[in-house]
Amino acid sequence: MVVWRNHSFKLIFMYRIFSISRLIPVIAITSLLTACGDSGGVVTICENDDALCQDLNSDPWCQRERESLISARFNLKQDETEQTQYSLLTSLSTYQECIKIAALIEPRTHPELKTLRVSAMLSTYDELLALEKQTLSSDNPYILNYHWVTHNNEAAKRRFIAISKKQSFDDPVLYFAIANIYGNNTGKVIINLLKGIHLLGDDPEMTTKLIYGLITAYMHQRNYDLAYLWSHVAIILEVENINLTLFTHNKISQIKKTRLEVLATRIAEQIREQEFTDESYKHILSSVRL
């Protein structure tokens, strides 16, 4: 069995509307760049290989995006893999979003900056198009999800779904992505969100997204008991903006609420200890006949 490994990715979330809810986000995954991602490392990269930097703007606009892009170019040059290609894809895309805005600004004291920004925008746009074309045939799940989310590429979506049925992932990001693809099938959404929760580490942002998604899915099913249960799990795990008033008009007795809160404590502890599994969840639910 092939297992896709977690390559230390952070997230950029782009929200879309699904019929299951208007709360579950689609994700475009972008890389957390490695050792050379700090400013000092980028300076060294540029000193040693100016070709990685010279077509980019050097003013303060988009500095973080610029540094990430330079690091991604460097990492790809050092070791060209699908993961470094993916990192460059997302870094180029993020830089493009920033530099397009900067290119519209008319600097008062240094008008030449606009020319440089426009040049950087065009250069990186061409680079992005070329890399997107190059990776169209890839079966890397991160790249497939990129093409689906960014360009609504149905073929990429179908291949991503096919891979998820045959292979296991060990990154919750990928299960979250699959859950969003299954937006109209609440049962499959829940299955994949639970798989993602099983893999959670110390990532508050991912924890929030997965649990929000699970609460939303259970609410969509009108399974208010489990929506209430996971709302309390979220509170225990310090997820913000959990609204328990959603349950004031639903038929959950106070006795049942108390039992669910006890179960929530057990589940939250399992998640913290990275011991939450599908089997442990089923066992907890069966103990109270849920």
Q: What residue spans do the PLM features occupy?
A:
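C-terminal motif of bacterial Sec signal peptides marking the signal peptidase cleavage site
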Residues: 32-35
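Terminal, low-structured helical/coil segments at or just beyond the last alpha-helical repeat
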Residues: 246-290
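Conserved positions within tetratricopeptide repeat
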Residues: 190-191, 225-228, 242-245, 257-261, ...
